[in-house]
């Protein structure tokens, strides 16, 4: 190294530490004056380090999500028909309204049933509802609601029904390639710029489609392009895994939700719960499942016992007992939450059923065999 070259610490030859701090505070103040308070901050000085959440209405799903739907984020819920997508969002709306919040429902499918919503606890008198004519209109309404900072949750049902104006004004059979994807991409850029400041949770419901010609891997995909997949902080895949019956009469379904993406908590968790026709998510059923896993309620054969006493034969009868004894159910819930806070592992807060993406990709690839003995 030449004799005249010296190594110095960054900034030591320019200004002292005190001068640098003064200059930094000056520029931070200038940025806040120009762009508003909170436009830049030290992460340790943030008033809300922990992301606030909205309950999903199902204790098992709250556990899988790390508390519920995150406030000020985009959430996507997708799955096949009649799997419980709308029911999930109506429960979230009911939870927001219970806390005194304001909720909006953008009904692009024009299929909202106010009687069913009311049966789930939604205050339909104060629910903001829009039935837009075009996708542009729907997303512009969402953007204005988010910008207002006066709405706590906005639900869009669904992305597949957000039809671009060019498609509506055209004739049947006209092809407009990528119009909906471009619309969603532009909308997500606008909405996410303000959603964090407003604290509004935006939930998009989406439908599944099949990719043509896929021989390896999952042929399913969601509508509206890839923008929503990137901008969403949480993506939930909900499936109907069982039909609940009493004799020959169907009274509900068993739903499984996979947390396909989560930016605010560990992803790839799985939650199961019952959805009862006309009543929505069985909160008592979720509580019983967790009580059994944590050992608060013990099952021996067909009988369930609590504190050594049999409380019901079979799951359905035990749920009825808990509904008829709300004080005991409250005590059980307190004990369950205490166990969970102590770190007790249950199915909903551990990653068990999903393979790592790399392993799935490896199994999806065709195997090439070489040599004369390959067929053997």
Swiss-Prot record:
Belongs to the RecA family. Signal peptide: none annotated. The lineage of its organism: Bacteria, Bacillati, Cyanobacteriota, Cyanophyceae, Synechococcales. Can catalyze the hydrolysis of ATP in the presence of single-stranded DNA, the ATP-dependent uptake of single-stranded DNA by duplex DNA, and the ATP-dependent hybridization of homologous single-stranded DNAs. It interacts with LexA causing its activation and leading to its autocatalytic cleavage. Gene3D superfamilies: P-loop containing nucleotide triphosphate hydrolases. It comes from the Bacteria. GO terms for cellular component: cytosol. The keyword DNA repair applies. Keywords: ATP-binding, Cytoplasm, DNA damage, DNA recombination, DNA repair, DNA-binding, Nucleotide-binding, SOS response. One of its GO terms (biological process) is SOS response. Residues 357-376 are annotated as: Disordered. ATP binds at residues 79-86. It comes from Synechococcus sp. (strain CC9902). It is found in: Cytoplasm. This is Protein RecA. Its main location: cytoplasm. GO terms for molecular function: ATP binding; ATP hydrolysis activity; ATP-dependent DNA damage sensor activity; damaged DNA binding; single-stranded DNA binding.
């Amino acid at each position: 190294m030449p004799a005249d070259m010296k190594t110095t610490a960054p900034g030591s030859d320019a200004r002292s530490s005190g001068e640098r701090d003064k200059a930094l505070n000056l520029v931070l103040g200038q940025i806040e004056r120009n762009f508003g308070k909170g436009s830049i901050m030290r992460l340790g000085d943030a008033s809300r380090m922990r992301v606030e959440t909205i309950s999903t209405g199902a204790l098992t799903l709250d556990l899988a999500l790390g508390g519920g739907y995150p406030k000020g984020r985009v959430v996507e819920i997708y799955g096949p028909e009649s799997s419980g997508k709308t029911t999930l969002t109506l429960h979230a709306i009911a939870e927001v309204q219970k806390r005194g919040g304001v909720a909006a429902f953008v009904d692009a499918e024009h299929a909202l049933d106010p009687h069913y919503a009311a049966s789930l606890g939604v205050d339909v008198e104060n629910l903001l509802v829009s039935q837009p004519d075009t996708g542009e209109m729907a997303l512009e309404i969402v953007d204005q609601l988010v910008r207002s900072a006066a709405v706590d949750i906005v639900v869009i049902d669904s992305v597949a029904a957000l039809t671009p104006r060019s498609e509506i004004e055209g004739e049947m059979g006209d092809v407009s390639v990528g119009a909906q994807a471009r619309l969603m991409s532009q909308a997500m850029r606008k909405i996410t710029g303000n959603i964090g400041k407003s604290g509004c949770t935006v939930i998009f419901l989406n439908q599944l489609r099949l990719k043509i010609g896929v021989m390896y891997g999952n042929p399913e995909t969601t509508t509206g392009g890839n923008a929503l997949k990137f901008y969403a902080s949480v993506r939930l895949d909900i499936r109907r895994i069982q039909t609940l019956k009493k004799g020959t009469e169907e009274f509900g379904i068993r739903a499984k939700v996979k947390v396909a993406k989560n930016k605010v908590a560990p992803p790839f968790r799985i939650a199961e719960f019952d959805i009862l026709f006309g009543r929505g998510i069985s909160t008592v059923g979720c509580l019983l499942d967790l009580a059994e896993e944590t050992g608060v309620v013990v099952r021996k054969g067909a009988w369930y016992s609590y504190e050594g006493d049999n409380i019901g034969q079979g799951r359905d009868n035990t749920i009825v007992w808990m509904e008829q004894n709300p004080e005991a159910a409250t005590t059980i819930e307190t004990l369950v939450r205490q166990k969970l806070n102590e770190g007790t592992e249950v199915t909903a807060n551990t990653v068990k059923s999903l393979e790592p993406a790399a392993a799935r990709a490896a199994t999806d690839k065709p195997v090439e065999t070489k040599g004369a003995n390959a067929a053997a």
